[in-house]
Amino acid sequence: MGELFRSEEMTLAQLFLQSEAAYCCVSELGELGKVQFRDLNPDVNVFQRKFVNEVRRCEEMDRKLRFVEKEIKKANIPIMDTGENPEVPFPRDMIDLEANFEKIENELKEINTNQEALKRNFLELTELKFILRKTQQFFDEMADPDLLEESSSLLEPSEMGRGAPLRLGFVAGVINRERIPMFERMLWRVCRGNVFLRQAEIENPLEDPVTGDYVHKSVFIIFFQGDQLKNRVKKICEGFRASLYPCPETPQERKEMASGVNTRIDDLQMVLNQTEDHRQRVLQAAAKNIRVWFIKVRKMKAIYHTLNLCNIDVTQKCLIAEVWCPVADLDSIQFALRRGTEHSGSTVPSILNRMQTNQTPPTYNKTNKFTCGFQNIVDAYGIGTYREINPAPYTIITFPFLFAVMFGDFGHGILMTLIAVWMVFRESRILSQKSDNEMFNTVFSGRYIILLMGLFSTYTGLIYNDCFSKSLNMFGSSWSVRPMFSKGNWSDALLETTPLLQLNPAIPGVFGGPYPFGIDPIWNIATNKLAFLNSFKMKMSVILGIIHMLFGVTLSLLNHIYFKKPLNIYLGFIPEIIFMSSLFGYLVILIFYKWTAYDAHTSKDAPSLLIHFINMFLFSYGDTSNKMLYKGQQGLQCFLVVVALLCVPWMLVAKPLVLRHQYLRRKHLGTHNFGGIRVGNGPTEEDAEIIQHDQLSTHSEEGEEFDFADTVVYQAIHTIEYCLGCISNTASYLRLWALSLAHAQLSEVLWTMVIHVGLSVRSLGGSLVLFFIFAAFAALTVAILLVMEGLSAFLHALRLHCCC
């Protein structure tokens, strides 16, 4: 379990890989996933490395596969994903893959080009068909005398006087429907009203051959006189991207053309169907293998990218690599290298040699499907230094527990648990489906977090005795009313005249002792329920928050002990723990003391902790209305405040001064030159312990100059941040109380405003009404209390773990 509570022990290893076996060895190491390669060519340009051509070839294959995938998705063909993890192809197989992908890409491009040309011809013929159909209606209307009178205005008055025959030209075409109004105004203004426009809508939308979108269009015919107007009309049509088509003048010619167009449309439709069938077959065949192809190509690209990080021996027969790897996995890494050498057919084994280094290794925390989500929560705030305590195991308990304190409801916890259990039991099937829904994938990846949050919420709901805003009377209330009549001053007359009465726990028999588990259900109907729960939850939030913060500070002690840094213990951890304990730890003790020191008989004389805590910082003890909790309280509190104040310079000044003293001492004990001869003063045993180089530190101390100003600034920032953080974070933990109160109130409002209405119906149709009201209640419960309130509590729990 050591690797769970602290990051894995890492080592730097050097690999000697034979050129013919390097590809397979890196492939096996990649499948193992236990090593991190270092870049041994940092000064070499990316485009000048040895395997850059292979990387480019892989990128080109990846581009072709993305094109094929785009076409598959455009055709709405499901991509088959069996969850198979194919082996990486050998380098010699790259040519076959390239040829296969090139063939598929060229075939699809050719099909798309031909299909686009066919669709363009089909669109033109379809538009021509509608033009012939609509223009026939226009010409039939020309026989109307009213239309002739309207059209006669196109002639000059002088021509009408001479009795010249009416000779009008016309053009016909198709234009997008939304451009018709602007098109008509432009014609009227440019041609000064000397044209006659008729238009009719095409009922069915037409497919654009380029984009594949369906567009609504209209047929138009424009009558004019003279070549000048004809040229203007054609330029306007060209500007509005209208398609013009030849239209015969005689009905017989139009009829013959329409017949020919319909025949060509039928033939073209048949060719289009065959082309689409062929395209579907090609895409369906590609959809079966494209996921496997993607994995193969990307594995090859990753291998060649990794090989570019290696150095090449001068003999060009060996590749040298440096990797960080866990010490516990060295045997499996050796086995992977042997397996890669065997697959390549090489007779020379690969060599792994451990190296000594002062560089800080990377942090590696082993996870599984259960701990992965909690580790991600920790890493979202920051990844710890190498071999530091890993907070993730503790977060497995603290995170869902703090969430449950805010979300505590037995009923809602059961619902959340059932949802998480469903995802856990069906995780294999859900993983195999490879859902593209990002929101669902996010929720599913945190299924074990949700499971624990639901279980802890069920537990805290039982403590709060809250189930959908109602209490569970499992053991019977510990409060009794009868002693108030027999031993108290209650009577029937008092009940009739007094709307509100208060039970007196000081009377024997009224209060029978604490409830066996959780809060007594009698509080659910008490008028002072909110005041009681607020007091309880507020104090509980402060207690939990301070314990959580003290635990976080205590974890730093384990790091200081492990890294053998006594200076950080004496000048960091001890003043920090004293500062927090003397102020906020004392507050927790006061809370418990007040709970135990005052009972039902003396509770009326109990002083206010808030006033005492404020007066503690103000050194104000003249208020006689708020009496002391115990003897010697004033002296003890003054002592604690002074101790806390002394801890501030202890944290702020002591460490920089000690570090400066150690630096000057090392410098004095260092080497000196006398007449060109280097002479050194060897440190004593005590000094050697002080200046011992820590190989596990975050950086190498060799060659570093001590900067006193930087150290003082850093320590000042840390001290101010810690002191202010103790205050602000303690206040932040009050959100446990606030969100718990909000959740309980929302649950009560939802019950009162929704389900209570259905239960109050006493008519024959009450069951039917209750059915629909319960459906609304269930939907609102899931949407508001589970999703919205759950997400809010999750984010606040995350915030509290970041401040710990």
Where would I find each of the regions flagged by the language model?
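Conserved, carboxylate-rich catalytic/transport cores that coordinate ions
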Residues: 2-11, 18-34, 182, 292, ...
